[in-house]
Swiss-Prot record:
SUPFAM superfamilies documented for this protein: Nucleic acid-binding proteins (SSF50249), RuvA domain 2-like (SSF47781)
SMART domains assigned: HhH1
Record-linked NCBIfam families: ruvA
Name of the protein described by the UniProt record: Holliday junction branch migration complex subunit RuvA
Region (Domain I): 1-67
Region (Domain II): 68-146
Pfam families: HHH_5, RuvA_C, RuvA_N
HAMAP family reported in the protein's UniProt record: DNA_HJ_migration_RuvA
Organism: Synechococcus sp. (strain WH7803)
Gene3D superfamilies from the UniProt entry: 5' to 3' exonuclease, C-terminal subdomain, Nucleic acid-binding proteins
Region Domain III, residue ranges: 159-215
Spans traversing the lipid bilayer: none
Length: 215
């Protein structure tokens, strides 16, 4: 099985919605399917290093390539979920960067997961249920520690930055973890009675209520 390739990128290709490159290694050209992000990352004639997952079938084999080993490892984890094939796993990684996809799975963010081509709500739910615990402890794939005000999934929540910082400090002092706080805030923001953006006390009460009910 091929797990890693290093050579020269001699051609880019697209066919039927799929895309990739041909990598010349030791006089042999390997056709490798990539995400659109990785395909656009380098030009023809440039040096190319890819972590590879090989899928073997009766009619031949397909190579899926990734610029980062963690991305390749997450791809392998995704195809272990019932109903998730290599093309769907690649679509998920094309839609989100590694730490974003891990966060979406751990958070059960179905809206984010279903943005990937071919991923419906039921499949997104299955991915979240089967992988949440496994990826929650997968430290290398988690987003670097950030303040809530810097989190992309929190920026759209209608709460002023000073109140947001105070809310984070208070909930962390009470023993809640980052993921729990983010889930609570998104739940409150999508609920029927969203507190005013400058009413930190109301946000705290609503968040604590949601956290107690979800425990």
């Amino acid at each position: 099985m091929i797990g890693w390739l290093q050579g020269e990128r001699i051609q880019s290709w697209e066919q039927g919605g799929r895309r990739g490159v041909v990598v010349a290694c030791g006089g042999v050209g390997y056709e490798v399917q990539l995400t659109s992000r990785d395909q656009n990352g380098q030009g023809t004639g440039s040096a190319c290093t890819l972590w590879v997952h090989q899928v073997q079938r009766d009619d031949g084999s397909t190579l899926f390539g990734f610029c980062d080993q963690q991305e390749r490892d997450l791809f392998r984890t995704l195809i272990g979920v019932n109903g998730v094939g290599p093309q769907m796993a690649l679509a998920l990684l094309d839609c989100c960067r590694v730490h974003e996809l891990v966060a979406a799975i751990v958070d059960g963010d179905l809206k984010r997961l279903t943005q990937a081509q071919g991923v419906g709500k039921r499949t997104a739910e299955r991915i979240a249920v089967e992988l949440r615990d496994r990826l929650g402890n997968w430290a290398p794939l988690q987003e670097p520690s950030l303040s809530l005000v810097d989190r992309s999934d929190v920026k759209a929540i209608p709460l002023g930055e000073p109140c947001l910082r105070d809310l984070q400090i208070t909930l962390e002092t009470l023993g809640y973890e980052d993921l729990e706080i983010r889930r609570a805030m998104r739940a409150v923001a999508s609920g029927p009675d969203v507190p005013a953006e400058d009413d930190g006390d109301a946000w705290l009460r609503a968040s604590l209520k949601w956290l107690s009910q979800s425990a």
